[in-house]
From Swiss-Prot:
GO terms for molecular function: heme binding; iron ion binding; monooxygenase activity; oxidoreductase activity, acting on paired donors, with incorporation or reduction of molecular oxygen. Its main location: membrane. This is Cytochrome P450 82C3. The chain crosses the membrane at residues 1-21. The keyword Lyase does not apply. Belongs to the cytochrome P450 family. Its cofactor is heme. Its EC number is 1.14.-.-. It is a single-pass membrane protein. Induction: By iron deficiency. GO terms for cellular component: membrane. Heme binds at C451. SUPFAM superfamilies: Cytochrome P450 (SSF48264).
Amino acid sequence: MDTSLFSLFVSILVFVFIALFKKSKKPKYVKAPAPSGAWPIIGHLHLLGGKEQLLYRTLGKMADHYGPAMSLRLGSSETFVGSSFEVAKDCFTVNDKALASLMTAAAKHMGYVFWLEMRKIAMIELLSNRRLQMLNNVRVSEISMGVKDLYSLWVKKGGSEPVMVDLKSWLEDMIANMIMRMVAGKRYFGGGGAESSEHTEEARQWRKGIAKFFHLVGIFTVSDAFPKLGWLDLQGHEKEMKQTRRELDVILERWIENHRQQRKVSGTKHNDSDFVDVMLSLAEQGKLSHLQYDANTCIKTTCLALILGGSETSPSTLTWAISLLLNNKDMLKKVQDEIDIHVGRDRNVEDSDIKNLVYLQAIIKETLRLYPAAPLLGHREAMEDCTVAGYNVPCGTRLIVNVWKIQRDPKVYMEPNEFRPERFITGEAKDFDVRGQNFELMPFGSGRRSCPGPSLAMQMLHLGLARFLHSFEVKTVLDRPVDMSESPGLTITKATPLEVLINPRLKRELFV
């Protein structure tokens, strides 16, 4: 009897000990630090400033105080903000799959809902190196035509003195034409008969729709903060998003129908001259049939994504690059001297020359570091509970990675706010690439939601900058410094026009 009681007593002690041991070993829930001052209902929304606030700078200042991993409550939505390359690496490697889902109001109504499948198709069929090589003539000819437009303006103004141009607008038109031709075989802006063509009204509608798209995507709506209140549409933004989508759909539908008619006329002799043709061929081969939407919706999705991906980002990067050079005249002279040494002044710069223009490549990298087109990587949500940088991130938490802050980290970059292209040649960043493998420099993002077209973007940036700097002397009016103010929005764009004086530095034959 005593033995049985003793055994029972020992068993109870062992059970209690095991239970207490397990409890002590159970990981504690650790939440990333949160700024003080959260209000009931709205949380930290009031700390982010108004519509003119540069959100990436505001979040950067918060990171200085609260650390590189931070929690925010934006309405009813929990948000995790990462502001160091270590946190970014944790997000885009170990937790890339867990943090790969988000549908904001803008994405829901304007980005379509099956972008992942279409991204795979675009990467394989549209943005491969082979396909980009086939479309190389479009990129080169549009840059040549853009340079010719500037030269023609100089001639029209007398052909003897420097003329003033708004380079920001010129770059936007040139890149838009380039992408539009690749996607739909259309040229909307500038010379070459674009403005006098039958598509003038369509071009106006398209530009208006794209501008409205970027404006709406940059707006933080009530439903983004309070998803359950989205049906109320208190601000009317969701209604406007749907209307903008319909307006763009009308034009996209017209493109597809025009291509179908052209293919009927050409019969079996048609070739896949642009992305719409490629997608129509895929549809005819049944390669889009496994998707949940019809072929037209698939094609419109891909076309819109490709156009939006480059229509604002690439011209913005070139605008910043030229602005930085104008404020650093010794560097402007250095890169023009480099081009003259490797190319001379008896021919135009070609793609094959870029590999020798090391300083020019460094200028593009340094510009992308200081002014990443997408300063905040968002549109992600935790699909499951995960741990980032030692902090618990519950399912449903939204993720923001502050690329702007990461790329100005003084622990990585010496004098991080200074324009120093040399850092990518012989300095601390000489081994950094821009394609998302080095988390200290990721202007195109990283992981599953990174930009699918960095190769095309870098080709446009390198040749576009090289051709302009080789073709023209450029300076500001009265040699004034360029205003480097940034405009609030989805991308980092220059707040003011880039008005400069240009003068040809090559012989006439190279412009005609």
